[in-house]
Swiss-Prot record:
GO terms for molecular function: metalloendopeptidase activity; zinc ion binding. The gene is htpX. The active site is at residue 130. It is a multi-pass membrane protein. Gene3D superfamilies: Metalloproteases ('zincins'), catalytic domain. The keyword tRNA processing does not apply. One of its GO terms (biological process) is proteolysis. Its cofactor is Zn(2+). This is Protease HtpX homolog. The chain crosses the membrane at residues 7-26, 33-47, 148-168, 180-200. CDD domains: M48B_HtpX_like. The keyword Transport does not apply.
Amino acid sequence: MINQIKTYLLMALLVGLIYAICMMLHIHPLIAIILALIPNVIAYYMSDKLVLMSYNARILEEHEMPWLHQMVERVARKAGLPKPKVAIVPTETPNAFATGRNPENAVVAVTEGILKLLSPEELEGVIGHEISHIKHRDILISTIVATLAGAIVMIAEWMLYWGGIFFVSEEEESNPLELIGTILLLILAPIAATIIQFAISRQREFYADEEGAKLTHPLWLANALAKLERGVELYPLERGNPATAHMFIINPFRKDFIAKLFSTHPPTEERIERLLEMCKRIGK
């Protein structure tokens, strides 16, 4: 229920943001409403397909990697969910993510790199983490946040390029305050997008770690996270949209100082410590 409320709030924020920008650009209110609603329709019905497409992910048929299908089905059954589709991402960056608007339309995507790096038990721990996201409907929030974050940056670029050029008549004098506002939006938009991801992602990852570990084994996931952290450092994702970073189990992009400051994920060391503490509590 809480995640559904968050989803509606995010969608309302996206509508309000785009509508306000359209008003600043002197677009007709009816057209502005249509433009504001389109991203939400896309976010709800197509964002999972767009995310998979952006990473050249391919849905695996049942006869392809049957052992992986069986693993996903086994963990999903423990969670009381239908088996999600399984996709493969052609990159050496070891990682995984889940997407889709609900458990009935979910996809678990794994990279070629993660299949090479992890043992079957460690991979099952990762699958448990992603299945937990699906069970608690984090995946719709993730895809909408990715759309919202991307939209914020895109709108800022629109305003810089179009503001005062296409939507201001020759008779109107340009307003220096609008120009200043446009420049400020361009500067602050990426920060705002990251803050939105930051607010949604960090606690969600801790919870998915714990719930996913209950479906499999906390030590399996702890070992997997340690390997993935090192693997991403060696093989960071060179191509991709940073607005989707929060969807992955580990941030797949190269981490400079600023990226670490505004990280969309909690520190991997802290996640591992929590899982090891969980091992002690349950005696595994």
